[in-house]
A protein has these predicted regions:
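Matrix-facing interhelical linker segments
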Residues: 1-320
Length: 320
């Protein structure tokens, strides 16, 4: 009994790790663009009409412009390609790959294990089970992986002219430790905890859609290949819809987290950052980079979840 449970946990660890790695590689350029859009260093560039004069960046004497032009996804993409070269679109991929496989592996293993436990407490496979399982898994994963995501964000925000050598992950980690100490690796963790709401929303919608789609089955005459193909695309659809809805609802925590992780930042705490961003840039600033996030996260989550489910299906089928 214990051996079967251990094998099941290892299966979810392996499947989650594979899914996360595949998704990270395919969507890395959009991750870099999204992080740049969320950064305050982009916010105060010359994107306003010239007749408006701003005061200091700290906000003293600042006159908020009545009309502003915010740089979009394609503007940032063009700027990165022209000034830094195409390799910069993969900044932070190293720590992302180092972190994403264990991160997804831990997440899916915790989610699966929590689901087993909560099914014994609440009505099996009910919404409350999915909410508690997703929340528990996200809390554990965020606590363990924040140092790696901190280094990744710093690397993505670093701007280097074409031809110059950027910091690698180890150099970046060493620099953070020397300038900020151990606490520096946990900047943005409170925002990540706030982001657990996104995970809960995502998995609740995903499990509900999966349950609904399972009820609409192909007729018995359908062959196995057709059935498996439809199941795979149904899972991708469920993952894409659930992540899209969750991202739109809970996106502001992403902007706050990026601001908290910036180097030499004036942003100190979650609430203080939220107030400062709202005061200096307006409430729309909380949704900067949302388009990049959606076109990155929707396919990424679809790839991760469908790869995870597919590997679980293959390995369980092989074990029979």
């Amino acid at each position: 009994m214990a051996g079967g449970s251990q094998e099941n946990t290892l299966l979810h660890l392996f499947a989650g790790g594979c899914g996360g790695t595949v998704g990270a590689i395919f969507t890395c350029p959009l991750e870099v663009i999204k992080t740049r859009l969320q950064s305050s260093k982009l916010a105060f560039r010359a994107v306003y009409y010239p007749q408006v004069q701003l005061g200091t960046i700290s906000g003293e004497g600042m006159v908020r412009p009545t009309t502003s032009v915010s740089p979009g996804l394609f503007s940032v993409l063009k700027s990165i390609l022209e000034k830094e070269g195409p390799r910069s679109l993969f900044r932070g991929l190293g720590p992302n790959l180092v972190g994403v496989a264990p991160s997804r592996a831990v997440y899916f293993a915790c989610y699966s294990k929590s689901k087993e436990r909560f099914n014994n407490i609440f009505v099996p496979n009910s919404n409350i089970v999915h909410i508690c399982s997703a929340g528990s898994a996200a809390f554990i994963t965020n606590s363990l992986m924040n140092p790696i995501w901190m280094v990744k964000t710093r690397m993505q925000l670093e701007r280097k002219v074409r031809g110059s050598k950027p910091m690698n992950a180890l150099q970046c980690a060493r620099y953070v430790y020397q300038t900020e100490g151990i606490r520096g690796f946990y900047r943005g963790l409170t925002a990540s905890y706030a982001g657990i709401s996104e995970t809960i929303i995502c998995f609740t919608i995903y499990e509900s859609l999966k349950k609904h789609l399972k009820e609409v089955q192909l007729p018995p005459s359908s062959n196995g290949t057709e059935r498996n193909s439809r199941n795979f695309f149904e899972l991708m659809f469920a993952a894409a819809v659930s992540k899209g809805c969750a991202s739109c609802i809970a996106y502001p925590h992403e902007v706050i987290r990026t601001r908290l992780r910036e180097e030499g930042t004036k942003y100190k705490a979650f609430i203080q950052t939220a107030r400062l961003v709202a005061h200096e840039e307006g409430y729309l600033a909380f949704y900067r980079g949302l388009f990049a996030q959606l076109i990155r996260q929707i396919p990424n989550t679809a790839i991760v979840l469908s790869t995870y489910e597919f590997i679980v299906y293959l390995l369980e089928d092989h074990a029979k």
